[in-house]
């Protein structure tokens, strides 16, 4: 039987198949890279706020305790945002004419809350409780990064499920003494795993990975 196609057709077919697979793989890698990029996750990207609040100045240089502003972090699922009255505790006496603080003064005069932009906004289908985490020895910087060194607040983690599960699967790598939970300069010791295992047992920490724990 006469050959219909030229021998070169075999080469073209192979190149087409391999090329298609390569392009699909390249496209998948590109999409994966985009999904992990700050452009998509907003990780390490400072959010625009009504007032350029600096954690570096307040928590770092002045040494304000996290709980001074985030008053409900130990007893509620939400850490809480400070009312304008908290800001005015200091700023009714210092930096009283600073133009960048005019929104704070206007908020106080008009008795109208500032509209802060959430930096770590979880989807509605995710349940998270701040109080249980801090009560089990999870420090602020574990999730929020070196907050006392950040001028304008940004998201330190991706907030992806994998990011949360890294800690839930091996809490001994991240847990710290309760006395150090609000210490923004805490550094894990060299024997972190040994200390972590001890604290996991002492604090009765469970490695919770069931879907219903966070997706209720």
PLM ranges: what are they?
Residues 58, 92-93, 131:
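Beta-hairpin (beta-strand-turn-beta-strand) motif
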Residues 63-72, 84-93, 140-146, 163-170, ...:
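The canonical Cys-X-X-Cys-His
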Residues 76-80, 97-101, 150-154, 174-177:
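Short Cys/His-rich "knuckle" micro-motifs
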Residues 124, 131-178:
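Soluble extracytoplasmic domains of inner/organellar membrane proteins
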Residues 18-22, 90-95:
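A short, flexible N-terminal coil/short beta segment enriched in small residues
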Residues 59, 88, 134:
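Nucleotide phosphate-binding site architecture
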Residues 4-6, 94-126, 171-216:
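Primarily the internal scaffold of c-type cytochrome electron-transfer domains
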Residues 1-52, 56-60, 64, 68, ...:
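N-terminal export/targeting leaders of redox proteins
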């Amino acid at each position: 039987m006469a050959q219909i196609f030229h021998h070169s057709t075999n080469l073209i077919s192979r190149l087409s198949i391999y090329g298609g697979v390569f392009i699909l793989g390249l496209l998948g890698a590109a999409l994966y890279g985009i999904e992990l990029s700050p452009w998509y996750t907003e990780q390490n990207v400072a959010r625009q706020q009504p007032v350029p609040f600096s954690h570096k100045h307040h928590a770092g240089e002045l040494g304000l305790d996290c709980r001074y502003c985030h008053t409900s972090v130990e007893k509620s699922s939400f850490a809480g945002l400070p009312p304008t009255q908290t800001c005015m505790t200091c700023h009714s006496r210092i930096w009283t004419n600073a133009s960048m603080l005019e929104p704070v003064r206007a908020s106080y005069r008009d008795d109208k809350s500032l509209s802060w932009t959430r930096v770590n906004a979880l989807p509605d289908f995710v349940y998270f409780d701040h109080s249980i985490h801090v009560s089990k020895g999870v420090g602020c910087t574990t999730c929020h990064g070196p907050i006392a060194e950040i001028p304008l607040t940004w998201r330190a983690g991706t907030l992806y499920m994998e990011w949360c599960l890294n800690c839930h699967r091996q809490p001994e790598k991240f847990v710290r003494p309760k006395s150090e939970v609000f210490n923004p300069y805490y550094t894990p010791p060299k024997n972190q795993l040994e200390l972590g295992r001890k604290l996991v047992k002492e604090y009765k920490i469970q490695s919770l990975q069931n879907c219903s724990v966070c997706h209720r």
